[in-house]
């Protein structure tokens, strides 16, 4: 994706120096999301919170986005009364604390489906994924990153997405 370099106040970690031309701010990254995209958000403790917050706080967010996710924890904002403040439509396969208020507000479609079926549905195109927002480990000596603790439905979303935006987490462990 063509982009301008990150602002000078944005420090690129040493581990990412060899990939400096691919490092952008969260705001720049989510700026590549198009109107009408179906955006998969990584799950559980591997939810890319910085990317989600950048998308939610974008000055001119893309229109008609659908955020698709399974299990999220403290990923989406709520006001002091507990109401969801998301700006987008959501589709979820799990009703956790993040989504309860939004479901009551009519902002989320709950799809009762076993998580074991979700990867097949994505692969068959029955669940659309245009963009995948994920969290990964820093690259190893060969430039490979790891999905770490979240290798549930993320591989299916990555393989189907037109655009994959990864938030690098230095604390993410590597998995095989």
Model-based region annotation:
Residues 1-176:
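Conserved alpha/beta enzyme-core scaffold
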């Amino acid at each position: 994706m063509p982009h301008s370099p990150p602002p000078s106040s944005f420090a690129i970690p040493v581990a990412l120096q060899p990939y400096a031309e691919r490092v952008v701010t969260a705001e720049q990254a989510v700026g590549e999301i198009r109107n009408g995209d179906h955006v998969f958000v990584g799950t559980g403790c591997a939810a890319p919170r910085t990317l989600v917050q950048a998308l939610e706080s974008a000055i001119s967010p893309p229109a008609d986005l659908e955020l698709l996710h399974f299990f999220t924890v403290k990923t989406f904002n709520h006001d002091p009364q507990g109401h969801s403040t998301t700006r987008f439509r959501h589709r979820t396969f799990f009703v956790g604390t993040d989504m309860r208020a939004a479901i009551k507000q009519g902002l989320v479609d709950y799809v009762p489906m076993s998580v074991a079926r979700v990867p097949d549905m994505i692969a068959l195109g029955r669940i659309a994924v245009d963009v995948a927002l994920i969290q990964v480990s820093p690259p190893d000596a060969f430039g490979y990153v790891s999905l770490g603790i979240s290798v549930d439905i993320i591989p299916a979303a990555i393989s189907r997405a037109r655009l994959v935006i990864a938030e690098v987490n230095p604390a993410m462990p590597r998995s095989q």
